[in-house]
């Protein structure tokens, strides 16, 4: 009898074939089910508590999947899909995960009919490509040539409202103010493109949070805000027509890299040593004054003696500014970052109409307005507590991304599940023209798309199945813009009339992220998991749950 061959390390578990596939599908479906209730304007929040006890309350899909510390490898594929969605378009993360889960659920039914995973994957790819082809035909191109026109602003307002309505804690006048701020910020930094759209660099829009007041106290600053204060009481608090030196060099005597000692034998030598140090710092300040600087913003420290000399020269100074802020200042002010003060020239200076220290709540902040490059803006958020501010920041980021997407590709689609239903109907027609078992996979893709309006109907308080049947019937009659008005709790024939719209770029990316994640999981037929480290075993974590366990068992998503 031949000796056994040990191929894998002792303790390694292996699940193969349909067991591995079903295990992975179950893990992905479980994650999608967790996010399901967070979809749409009336989506519910999740309370996430990390290992340090910090609490996050949010219904933002990207934040939920990032903070959940998911362990199952298949569920991690959905997390990566959500991250890709967030990085690419900044919105639609919950939709992408929910749709991927629905695609896998429908695929599981096909697997039960003994349809090979390869056929399902090919069918899904054909359905995805057909959906991408149909989207521009079902959308409406909008005119945004003049961003300051009432027509363009009205369209941008509708997009921002659709995004913020599902997330933002504000309503009424507060919500309107936030929408206006977001639109003003985007319009301010938009650069025209040859195709009629606009390029928007979101790096030029900075968001700062300051506890105190209410959301309505938030302001948009056409310039930048530094969460710092002027370093010396003798310095001016307000400088107009500011010539600004942006430094990443320290205004202090730096310690030598090698250890050194000095031998002092008399008090005069101490005085001479200190005088030389003061002269060194004074020379640096004199150099900055000689090139015309009346404001100094430093990434590193500013010595007390240097502060004194700067104050005597009437120069406003701020120290220990974040590197990211220094880089934004370089762009906004038209400055060059000064690394060597002795080599600084007047051409290195940036310009702003006003630099002023102001009190915000209990703190002081430095406002830089009227910058040379007026495209840099700063949104200063106010709120009653840190959790509200964090959620407001996430919401505004999503709205900024949504507006950027519509400016890059100015085509809008009907929201409220209308586009998914219309795509599903068209894909079923397309499936009939495709021969073989792939037809079933395309129909399954269409069924999965209907999961979105189904969930929206549920969150609106409607009876889900009867609502879906009603929506299908209306779309069959040619009412292609029929969707769910979640806020009103009813089905409407024209979601455009209620400003329920979505950018085509977001929807295209949702389809791409969900299809790629689902097909990647369907391709896996072998799950090989190494034994956990001994320290993990001592912690009581079994290897079977870590690796997905035996085929058909419930996978563990988290720790």
Curated annotation (Swiss-Prot):
Keyword Ribonucleoprotein: no
Keywords annotated in UniProt: ATP-binding, Chaperone, Nucleotide-binding
GO molecular function terms noted in the UniProt entry: ATP binding; ATP hydrolysis activity; ATP-dependent protein folding chaperone; unfolded protein binding
Example GO biological process: protein folding
Classification via Pfam families: Cpn60_TCP1 (PF00118)
Record-linked InterPro entries: Chaperone_TCP-1, Chaperonin_TCP-1_CS, Cpn60/GroEL/TCP-1, GroEL-like_apical_dom_sf, GROEL-like_equatorial_sf, TCP-1-like_intermed_sf, TCP-1_chaperonin, thermosome_alpha
SUPFAM superfamilies reported in the protein's UniProt record: GroEL apical domain-like, GroEL equatorial domain-like, GroEL-intermediate domain like
Renumbered residue ranges of the record's region Disordered: 535-559
PANTHER family cross-referenced by the UniProt entry: CHAPERONIN
Function as written in the Swiss-Prot or TrEMBL entry: Molecular chaperone; binds unfolded polypeptides in vitro, and has a weak ATPase activity.
Name the UniProt record assigns to this protein: Thermosome subunit alpha
Organism annotation: Saccharolobus solfataricus (strain ATCC 35092 / DSM 1617 / JCM 11322 / P2) (Sulfolobus solfataricus)
Lineage: Archaea, Thermoproteota, Thermoprotei, Sulfolobales, Sulfolobaceae
């Amino acid at each position: 009898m031949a000796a056994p061959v040990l191929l894998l390390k002792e303790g390694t578990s292996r699940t193969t074939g349909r067991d591995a596939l079903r295990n992975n599908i179950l893990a992905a479906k479980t994650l999608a089910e967790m996010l399901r209730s967070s979809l749409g304007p009336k989506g519910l929040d999740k309370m996430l508590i990390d290992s340090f006890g910090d609490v996050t309350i949010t219904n933002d899909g990207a934040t939920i999947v990032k903070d959940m510390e998911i362990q199952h490898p298949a569920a991690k594929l959905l997390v990566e899909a959500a991250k890709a969605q967030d990085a690419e378009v900044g919105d639609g993360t919950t939709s992408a995960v929910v749709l991927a889960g629905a695609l896998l659920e429908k695929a599981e039914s096909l697997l039960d009919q003994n349809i090979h995973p390869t056929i399902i994957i090919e069918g899904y790819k054909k359905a995805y490509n057909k959906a991408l082809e149909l989207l521009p035909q079902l959308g409406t191109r909008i005119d945004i040539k003049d961003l300051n026109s009432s027509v363009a602003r009205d369209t941008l307002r509708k997009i921002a409202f659709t995004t913020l309505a599902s997330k933002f804690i504000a309503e009424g006048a507060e919500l309107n103010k936030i929408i206006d701020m977001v639109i003003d910020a985007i319009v301010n930094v938009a650069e025209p493109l040859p195709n009629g759209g606009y390029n928007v660099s979101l790096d030029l829009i900075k968001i700062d949070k300051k506890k105190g007041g209410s959301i309505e106290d938030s302001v948009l600053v056409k310039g930048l805000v530094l969460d710092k204060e002027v370093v010396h009481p003798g310095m001016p608090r307000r400088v107009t027509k500011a010539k600004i030196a942006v430094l990443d060099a320290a205004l202090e005597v730096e310690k030598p890299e090698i250890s050194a000692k000095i031998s002092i034998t008399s008090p005069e030598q101490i005085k001479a040593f200190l005088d030389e140090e003061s002269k060194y710092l004074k020379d640096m300040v004199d150099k900055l004054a000689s090139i015309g600087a009346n404001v100094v913003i430093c990434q590193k420290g500013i010595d007390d003696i240097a502060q004194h000399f700067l104050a005597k020269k009437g120069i406003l100074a701020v120290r220990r500014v974040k590197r990211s802020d220094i880089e934004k200042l370089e762009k906004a002010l038209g400055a060059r970052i000064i690394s060597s003060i002795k080599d600084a020239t007047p051409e290195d200076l940036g310009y702003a109409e006003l630099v002023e220290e102001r009190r915000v709540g209990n703190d002081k902040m430095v406002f830089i307005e009227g910058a040379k490059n007026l495209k840099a803006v700063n949104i200063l958020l106010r709120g009653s507590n840190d959790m509200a501010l964090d959620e407001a920041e996430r919401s505004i980021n999503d709205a900024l991304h949504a507006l950027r997407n519509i400016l890059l590709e100015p085509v809008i689609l009907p929201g409220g599940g209308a586009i998914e239903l219309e795509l599903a109907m068209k894909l079923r027609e397309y499936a009939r023209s495709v021969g073989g078992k792939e037809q079933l996979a395309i129909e399954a893709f269409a069924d999965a798309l209907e999961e979105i309006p189904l969930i929206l109907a549920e969150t609106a308080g409607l009876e889900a199945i009867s609502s879906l049947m009603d929506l299908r019937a209306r779309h069959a009659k040619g009412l292609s813009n029929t969707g769910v008005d979640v806020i009103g709790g009813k089905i409407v024939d024209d979601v455009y009339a209620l400003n329920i719209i979505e950018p085509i770029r977001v929807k295209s990316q949702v389809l791409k992220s969900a299809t790629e994640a689902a097909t990647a999981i369907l391709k896996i037929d072998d799950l090989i998991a190494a034994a956990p480290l001994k320290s993990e075993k001592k912690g009581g974590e079994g290897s079977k749950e870590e690796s997905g366990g035996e085929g058909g068992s419930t996978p563990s998503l988290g720790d």
